[in-house]
Amino acid sequence: MSGTLVRMAGPTVVAEGLAGASLNEVVRVGEERLLGEIIRIEGDRATIQVYEETAGLALGEPVEASGEPLAVELGPGLLGSVFDGVQRPLSELAAREGDFLGRGASLPALDRARAWEFEPAVAPGDRVEGGVRLGVARAPGAPDHPVVVPPGVAGRVAEVRAGARRVEEPAVLLEGGATLALLERWPVRRPRPARRRLPPDVPFLTGQRVLDCFFPVSAGGTAVVPGGFGTGKTVLEQSLAKWAAADVVVYVGCGERGNEMSEVLDEFPRLEDPRTGGPLLARTVMIVNTSNMPVAAREASIYTGAAIAEYFRDMGRSVALMIDSTSRWAEALREISARLEEMPGEEGYPTYLASRLARFYERAGRVETLGGAEGAVTMVGAVSPPGGDLSEPVTQCSLRATGALWALSADLAHRRHYPAVDWSVSFTLEGDRLAGWFEREAGDGFGALRDEARKLLQRERELAEVAELVGTESLQDAERLVLESARLLREGFLRQSALDPADATCPPAKAFEMLRLFLEWHRRAGAAIGAGVPLRSILDTGLGARLLRLGQLPAAEVPAAAAALRADLSEALARMEAE
């Protein structure tokens, strides 16, 4: 089916003669066959968002409908790849086209020439359905790739073709003539089905103490990370990619500046995966859509990332989907909405911004897959509010749709406190659901310690305002102890060095032991002050400096170091009280 161009407005064009076309159908626009997607149909007129630069198009040029929705290719070779927002392989296109892509440039997302050794797990006569594992695809230098039956496909196996297969070649033939290859295609805007959702009672461990202990998120949960320029969003996401409990990381660079994305592309291949010792990129899929790329492709990029993440989830893997940033995606939505002449909402964003964000975040979750395995997609969406204003629409809509807020503070970042998570603004809605897991796995009383630490930090904020007016020396020793204990907690527990091998990640048991010791120091020092011991004498023992060094110790050495410090604290306080 083909039509002709009758109207153009930036990345949005209108074609007529497409009466039989469907919403979200892929089309090729103009003589250069630019990629586009139908976003509105009125009679035989279709409004199309074009995923490439539209300058130079002329009225009357042909528009050809494909009959298929915008879809991604899923199969062996995804891991370690870098795509643009509509899954064009950037490395291969750069080798063919140079550093700047020509219009209409297109290549298959997965390498058609590469051969994979298919080792089947089914035999003729077996009945298979969506989610059943067909076998494993292997290739030198690549991780093993499970091959599963796509959702909606079922039948009895007629023939299995083991051995070297290219991704498009049939690997399993079903009775009735249907074939299953290593490659499948899936519409990006349609969530992949699962057998059932599982309760969110297992945490998504990040390795960052401030997040795991104070603001945890469940595996399959959602978190929003708002922060202004220079607050460490990218460094935090790199730390999460490296240390979080995820088998696969899907990183979507949505509308960020080109130099920032080039820095990420330069650094990611050099990051070492602590699990395997190999490059972190080997278990990462990167989707790059910079701010100078067409705005429509930016809108599609997060759905491309979600479809890829759900594909790996259906293999029984835990996937971390990171979007940097949803603000740029919302700006693309605003521009497209303006081109469509829709009624604007707050700050010009479309009125359906909240529902679109909520629908996207609903694709996260911990599920039992169609094949009976357990998989999860955990979403972490960065937000770039102008001027750090958390009351702007994208942040507020994200807060309503997600389970945690990890707010980054420019003030903490300027003080070189990383991760710069503001504990006075951040929150989680999943703390109570995850409390049982932390009590079992980290240590009994974990929740009580966390609440005590929060109260200590809140008390410090109150006293800091008084101290600014009258000076620290005017406070009583008990009040000055609160300030000192909170300082130790901030610098020794909440702050982490991403460059220190022992401190870059922290397991829950180590975090529990550290938190217990910090608060025990505060309680026992407070009791000693109540018995008449001056605060200066307690500080002169040097035990506070030893507390600050706990995080730099390997997790296996922390219990012994904590026991020694606890014994020295008891001895020092007993001696001072006796004097």
Swiss-Prot record:
A single GO BP annotation from the record? Answer: proton motive force-driven plasma membrane ATP synthesis
**InterPro entries attached to this UniProt entry:** ATP-synt_VA_C, ATP-synth_a_Xtn, ATP_synth_asu-like_sf, ATPase_F1/V1/A1_a/bsu_N, ATPase_F1/V1/A1_a/bsu_N_sf, ATPase_F1/V1/A1_a/bsu_nucl-bd, ATPase_F1/V1_b/a_C, P-loop_NTPase
> So what does this thing catalyse?
ATP + H2O + 4 H(+)(in) = ADP + phosphate + 5 H(+)(out)
Q: Which GO terms describe its molecular function?
A: ATP binding; proton-transporting ATP synthase activity, rotational mechanism; proton-transporting ATPase activity, rotational mechanism
Asked if the keyword Nucleotide-binding belongs to this entry, the reply reads yes
Q: What is this protein called?
A: V-type ATP synthase alpha chain
Gene3D superfamilies in the cross-refs: 2.40.30.20, 2.40.50.100, Bovine Mitochondrial F1-atpase, Atp Synthase Beta Chain, Chain D, domain 3 (1.10.1140.10), P-loop containing nucleotide triphosphate hydrolases (3.40.50.300)
- Residues recorded as binding ATP, renumbered to this chain, are 227-234
Q: What is its EC number?
A: 7.1.2.2
Question: From which organism does this entry originate?
Answer: Anaeromyxobacter dehalogenans (strain 2CP-C)
What SUPFAM superfamilies does the entry give? C-terminal domain of alpha and beta subunits of F1 ATP synthase (SSF47917), N-terminal domain of alpha and beta subunits of F1 ATP synthase (SSF50615), P-loop containing nucleoside triphosphate hydrolases (SSF52540)
Tell me the keywords, alphabetical order.
ATP synthesis, ATP-binding, Hydrogen ion transport, Ion transport, Nucleotide-binding, Translocase, Transport
Broad class of enzyme this protein falls into: translocase
Which Gene Ontology terms of cellular component type are present? proton-transporting ATP synthase complex
Stated family: Belongs to the ATPase alpha/beta chains family.
Function text? Produces ATP from ADP in the presence of a proton gradient across the membrane. The V-type alpha chain is a catalytic subunit.
